[in-house]
Amino acid sequence: TTWASSTTDQVTVTSAAKSSTAKKVDLRKAINQTPTTAAATANIPAPIYHGEAMVLIHADNNEVLLSHNATERLNPASTTKVVTLLTTLLRDGTHLDTLANITPYAASMEPSVLGVRAGDQVPLIDVAEGMMVSSGNDAAVVLAQNVSGSIPAFARAMNETAKLAGATDSNFLNPHGLTEAGHYTTALDLAHIAAYGMRIPMFRDLVADEYFTVPYQNRAPETVHTTNFFIRSHYPGANGLKTGYTEAAGECLIASATRGGQTLIVVLLNDDFRWDDAPKLLDYGFKRLGIT
């Protein structure tokens, strides 16, 4: 389906490196939530785009610049991992610098994997970064089991995190996004969650990599490359975020870019032309803000 739509007008972290030496910090208290506003430029034609649902927002104040079916409940596929990452960073008692306990169940996950093995020695923060780069379902389960003890407990924490970030109609049942009855979100909720995360420097750092070398302590390091062609395309200002695909969800993408100090986020759900649509929609958004 092709859509052409009219416009809809309407965290700073204390020094903590994304490594095994990272210090535990209270990320929620460190978030700078002061919105940045910018006057929208009128009379700019919206681009033609595709997909079942879409929303384009100004990440600094959550202003919706363009949307289509943005509140429709849909399968999010691996865009779920944005919530998994945010929950891992915000959950009380999480020690990101400690070695993860990797169970046989986590290591058995398919089909997109980081490649961890049961008993591997690698810090939790590096599992999180590897998850975002490789879209590893195994890494997502490792995070869930280490942060909350079980997938059901972590899913409850994910839903708390989503609400904290401004989501109003989402229900997450697993950390990886594989299809499960009752696991759903909306494009608008994903945009709000991503925008909340992008106010946290550590989150921003972990969602922007083209590749990452996993520093296993018990075997040779392994390098994984991003599944996100939007990041690899070097779109001007591109700095995240996450891909997703399952047969039920179709092709999904959360893409973010920052120009002139302004960050925009576009969410595309079930969009076979996501790599073409994301740059066009972001270009439109920056023009709306008077940024080229």
What are the residue ranges of the model-derived segments?
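Alpha-helix capping and helix-coil boundary motifs
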Residues: 1, 93-95, 273, 285-286
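Domain-terminus/edge residues, biased toward the C-terminal soluble/receptor-binding domains
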Residues: 168, 179-292
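Active-site-adjacent loops and short helices of periplasmic peptidoglycan-processing enzymes
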Residues: 3, 9-18, 22-188, 192-201, ...
